[in-house]
A protein has these predicted regions:
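A local structural motif
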Residues: 113-119, 157-166, 247-253, 303-315
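A short, structured surface patch at a secondary-structure boundary
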Residues: 122-181, 185-186, 190-201
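Structured C-terminal subdomain patch of bacterial secreted/periplasmic proteins
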Residues: 230, 329-403
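Bacterial Sec-exported substrate-binding components of ABC uptake systems
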Residues: 2-3, 12, 16-19, 23-56, ...
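Alpha-helical, coiled-coil/dimerization segments enriched in small aliphatic residues
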Residues: 241, 289-319
Length: 403
């Protein structure tokens, strides 16, 4: 993630195999240049680990959620094991909008300025950018993704009717099909740390993006590895440049709901300063999170949540702790990462039996857990739900550890 070195272990692991090379000879290109190593969300992906679940654990009880929970009742209700921080709402689907006409100009995260004589209407986007654009009523003609579109957690709340696919496995892009769709613009999320455009490139190999540039101009929206909120702001800025009126009643209400959720989260954090969080991914060992490397939890820290930080990491993101020693990171509430690469119906109640020794963490033993669906938050509406679910979990938690 944000502060990992390339190739380091991170929560977005590729368990898929790249598709066969595409015949792009008529473009005058060497197809061998376009087969690159698989990539994780924040760098090159390592060999896949299966069954991965990351758990974010919060120490101590917390306060209210969505401004509706009385903090005097904190700890009197059980934490909802079925709460879904990536649940969809009516606000996740915004009707197509009439965009302002005229020329389009935008300087992207790579420092490139894209200038078009008219607003683009035929847009191809990666799954992150597509989800964000659709939250502003802009529907792409095609999407490339790391899983089939219908199973993508990032796209799960979007209306995909009529959208073509130009890639459904990690690091693949169907150049032939994309060219046949005659796009005006190709948009991908850009990670400045790794030079990664749409999970197709690395700092060492930009050939796939270079190839797409021969089909249509490419635009990289900056992924802020220190703040999910800032990444969403970047997408809002792009939507405005694409002619969307951000002050329409629906969009204004969505932003207002988000602001209210953040305000409530800050209230919860300020009222429960005994709360400390720690992130853990149970695999062969416990991977303990450095929260400053995660854009979601960097936001939560900036909003007042206290997080446990390990004494150093092995890769800039995780510190490996043996199961024999995991009790040293004891905690009161567990936020369980839903591994996108191995996504399935996670039953939180079953977690302790899958990882012997994991229940030495008090939160796991006491069944005080909630899911963490990292990577789904590319819009204000999706992030609002996540923030509300977490505030609710904090409000219901009991302190089950001793200082």
């Amino acid at each position: 993630m944000g502060h990992r070195e390339e190739g380091a272990l991170g929560p977005y692991l590729d368990t898929r195999k790249n598709g066969a090379p595409l015949d792009i000879g008529h473009l005058g290109l060497d197809e061998s240049r376009h087969v690159t190593p698989t990539s994780s969300r924040f760098g090159s992906a390592p060999r896949a680990l299966t069954g991965g679940i990351a758990v974010l654990v919060l120490l101590a009880a917390a306060a209210c959620s969505s401004g509706t929970t009385d903090t005097d009742d904190a700890g009197t209700q059980a934490v909802d094991l079925n709460a879904n921080p990536a649940a969809c709402s009516a606000n996740d689907r915004v009707d197509s909008v009439d965009r302002a006409s005229g020329p389009f100009t935008y300087t992207d995260g790579r420092g490139r300025t894209v200038s078009l004589d008219a607003q683009p209407t035929r847009i191809i986007a990666d799954e992150e950018s597509a989800a964000a654009l659709m939250s502003y009523g802009i529907k792409p003609i095609a999407i490339w993704s790391t899983t089939p579109m219908g199973t993508s957690p990032i796209l799960s709340c979007s209306d995909l009717t009529g959208i073509e696919s130009v890639g459904e496995t990690w690091g693949t892009f169907d150049f032939e099909k994309a060219a046949s769709l005659d796009p005006d613009l190709v948009i991908g999320e850009f990670n400045p740390r790794f030079g990664q455009f749409g999970k197709l490139t690395t700092t060492a190999d930009s050939s796939k993006a270079d190839t797409i540039d021969r089909i249509a101009p490419t635009l990289g929206v900056t992924l802020d590895t220190t703040s999910t909120a800032k990444t969403i702001e970047n997408y809002a800025g792009l939507a405005s440049s694409l002619g969307v009126d951000l002050d329409t009643p629906q969009l204004a209400d969505i932003k207002s709901d988000y602001d209210a959720a953040v305000t409530n989260f800050k209230k919860v954090a300020s009222e429960r300063q005994d709360l400390t969080g720690v992130g853990v991914w149970p695999l062969d060992v416990a991977y303990v999170l450095d929260p400053s490397a995660d854009p979601d939890f960097s936001d939560y820290e900036s909003w007042g949540l206290k997080m446990y930080t390990p004494d150093g990491t092995d890769d800039g993101y995780w510190k490996k702790v043996s199961w024999e020693n995991v009790s040293s990171v004891d905690a009161d509430v567990a936020f369980v990462y839903h591994d996108v690469a191995n996504a399935s119906d996670v039953k939180l109640a079953d977690i302790p039996s899958r990882y012997p020794g994991f229940d030495t963490i008090s939160a796991v033993e006491k069944q005080q857990m909630v899911l963490w669906d990292y990577g789904a938050n590319k819009s204000y509406s999706r992030y609002t739900n996540t923030i509300d679910v977490y505030a609710d979990a904090m409000s219901k938690a009991q302190k089950v550890t001793t200082e």
